[in-house]
């Protein structure tokens, strides 16, 4: 697990540009911040609107958040969701379990990214 605390992540979001996106019919702002190879994302809507099996394309990740060319998510702070960041920067979210429960502190979830 990464050592960055949820407070540090939440504080970083306060000064991070957002991208307007749509997830399962809900509009909201997605915030991105990076600590090393960990990209944290926040979406200010109701993750429970993502039903099991949904795989919406969330957004295009800005170039600054793509330090590696091949990457896959190893962990998230929700047990139901898996994120993939494609080489073109688009992000896909797959929910294989029950509906995703909102996280506290800005509804963020963390993506552990590996690659070279």
Which residue ranges define each predicted feature?
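Fibrous stalk/shaft segments of extracellular and virion attachment machinery
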Residues: 1-17
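Structured loops at beta-to-helix junctions and adjacent beta-edge loops in soluble globular domains
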Residues: 42-44, 96
């Amino acid at each position: 697990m990464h050592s960055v605390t949820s407070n540090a992540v939440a504080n970083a979001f306060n000064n991070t540009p957002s991208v307007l996106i749509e997830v399962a019919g809900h509009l909201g702002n997605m915030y991105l911040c990076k600590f090393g190879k960990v990209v944290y994302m926040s979406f200010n809507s109701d993750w429970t609107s993502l039903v099991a099996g949904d795989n919406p394309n969330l957004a295009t990740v800005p170039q600054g958040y793509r330090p590696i060319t091949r990457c896959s998510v190893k962990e998230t702070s929700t047990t139901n969701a898996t994120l993939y960041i494609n080489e073109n920067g688009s992000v896909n979210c797959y929910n294989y379990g029950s509906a995703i429960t909102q996280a506290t502190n800005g509804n963020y979830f963390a993506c552990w990214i590996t690659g070279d």
